[in-house]
Amino acid sequence: VRVYVGNIREIRKVDAHAIDIVTQEPFVILPQTVSRWYIMSKAWCEKNNAVRPVDVRKGTENYASTHANGTGPFKLESRQPGVKTVFAVNPDWWGKAEHNLSQAVFTPIGNDATRVAALISGEMDLVDPVPLQDVPRIQKSPDLKIMQSPEMRTIFLGMDQKRDELLASNVKGKNPFKDRKVRQAVYQAIDIEAIRTRIMRGVATPAGLMVAPTVVGFVPELNKRLPFDPDGARKLLAEAGYPNGFEVGMNCPNDRYVNDAEICQAVASMLAKVGVKVNLTAEPKTQFFPKVLQRNVSFYLAGWTPVSQDSHNLLFAVISTPGEGAQGQFNGGSYSNAKVDELTRKIGAESDAAKRLAMITEAFKIHQDDIGHIPLHQQPITWGMRK
């Protein structure tokens, strides 16, 4: 949430239905970010000792972590963690309902086969996600349909570029990822077409940029990947002083992104062919994300969706040098470029669309030339539902 409210200096009550929002500095995408603010009752928070936000990076929780405030269109009727959560329509909601539901039941089903079977049997009306390999089977059913499109989320690889020695590597006394040649070698060892066709069943969109085409600031001419070139990757590693490659630990979630663990396994296999041995740790997101947020990873796979639909969100949260508040909060590898930081600050305040786009383009070009991260693709979102 800090990513969306970190620039807010003060919120003043004007009257019962109006507030003034005061920012630290001009912030042109404030209207887009307001929709991501989750408003809670002050009285409820005070009553339940949940006024102070918790720090997910430290694994802390409070009452609000497991209980609903109930200010939305639905209210919590019952909850069995990991089993079932039942919502009923909130008759006191301040908005206008745009549905005909009386109840919504959410049932977490971690097993892909069981989830699909629940849809096919009629036990569930809608499931998300549908495993890509099951899409054709559902499409053949006369009672079911698939809704699928590319997400705004870009899946990427990050590398620790700050430590003098990686946390997980056989290289001692230096950090291979500080060398651009090594980062380029890793990039060019990855066969993105193989990942697209074999793992993503042809429905992922390969990415050369860290944002999707639907995001403000997307630059088509920069959306080009470095070519897959394993021979060139081996040459770059040798030039960087690693003719026999090296070992590195990789962290990857196995329950967050579409086929995340399978992608990481493929990346590990591809890097092995150029001499980089990847020791992969695929783990639940509850274990994975605290490590990324604390920047205790050497090499990792993650994804980002600029929910403001603006490139500034990604530049500020993922690419900027980690700093005060939410700046660089999701920059797990501590990539840092002073010029990118300067441009990001200006982009947040610039209201002239043409000037702003020029600065976004410059920032992305610098980051791309640095190989600050390695973009992979925009993953698909796939829902299965009853007709």
Predicted regions and their residues:
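Gly/Pro-rich hinge or "lid" segments in bacterial periplasmic/extracellular proteins
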Residues: 35-99, 103-105, 230-231, 235
